[in-house]
A protein has these predicted regions:
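Hydrophobic, membrane-inserted alpha-helices
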Residues: 25-29, 139-146, 162-170
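Aromatic-anchored segments of alpha-helical transmembrane domains
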Residues: 51-59, 109-120, 162-174
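Residue-level detector of conserved catalytic or cofactor/ligand-binding positions
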Residues: 179-185
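Membrane-helix boundary connector in multi-pass membrane proteins
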Residues: 63-66, 148-160, 167-179
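Membrane-proximal helix-loop-helix units in multi-pass membrane proteins
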Residues: 70-144
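Membrane-interfacial loop-to-transmembrane alpha-helix junctions, especially the N-terminal start
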Residues: 40-50, 99-106, 151-162
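N-terminal topogenic module of multi-pass integral membrane proteins
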Residues: 1-66
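Membrane-helix interface and helix-disruption motif detector
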Residues: 7-17, 60-74, 120-134, 172-179
Length: 186
């Protein structure tokens, strides 16, 4: 678990200004989709999603998570999601047509990337060794919220990849918690 938090600390120390800009761009583009869902706004959001998932793949996993086992696989995984968004940009498959049916759930999902840092603080963590808005979990819940908010027709491959990633991550957390519980205390 120490390697996990150390890699997060290194990532946050080196990229926190960029993470703030990426988060601000995401807020701006999401707001634009709600207020003025023009073709430009929709394409800009897809370009942002290509960038965001590419960032997780290259910067987060390849540059800062090298000490973790299997980081290449996760980098490829998030790279595939970036390519799926790129494909969507050129095909126009996901039209980002608003669906107000799940407003409450979407609100919760949009809030989660901002709650992760607060939960880290509540657990006694401090910057830079804490979760932030531009990390895999945050990006995954934001993406699910975005696709749910604009769910008239969505790219199911993106959803399938995110669900597979979530299952892998959940099982990893469960196994690590069992290891942590079974460690003898001194």
């Amino acid at each position: 678990m120490e390697i996990f938090w150390n890699t997060i600390a290194q990532y946050n120390e080196a990229t926190w200004w960029t993470q703030l800009l990426i988060t601000a761009a995401g807020i701006l583009l999401t707001t634009q989709l709600y207020r003025k869902p023009t073709l430009w706004a929709k394409r800009s959001m897809k370009i942002y999603m290509v960038f965001l998932n590419g960032w997780i793949s290259i910067v987060y996993y390849m540059m800062y998570c090298g000490a973790r086992g299997h980081h290449h696989i996760l980098a490829i995984f998030w790279g595939v999601i970036a390519v799926l968004w790129l494909w969507d940009l050129f095909t126009g498959y996901t039209p980002f047509e608003r669906n107000p049916k799940y407003k409450v759930l979407v609100g919760v999902l949009y809030a989660m990337p901002f709650l992760y840092p607060l939960l880290s603080w509540a657990r006694g963590m401090e910057f830079p060794m804490m979760t932030t808005t531009v990390m895999p979990c945050s990006v995954a819940v934001f993406t699910i919220g975005l696709l749910l908010a604009f769910s008239r027709r969505v790219n199911l491959l993106v959803i399938l990849f995110l669900c597979h990633w979530a299952l892998i991550a959940f099982s990893k957390v469960y196994i690590l918690s069992l290891i942590h519980i079974s460690e003898p205390t001194r």
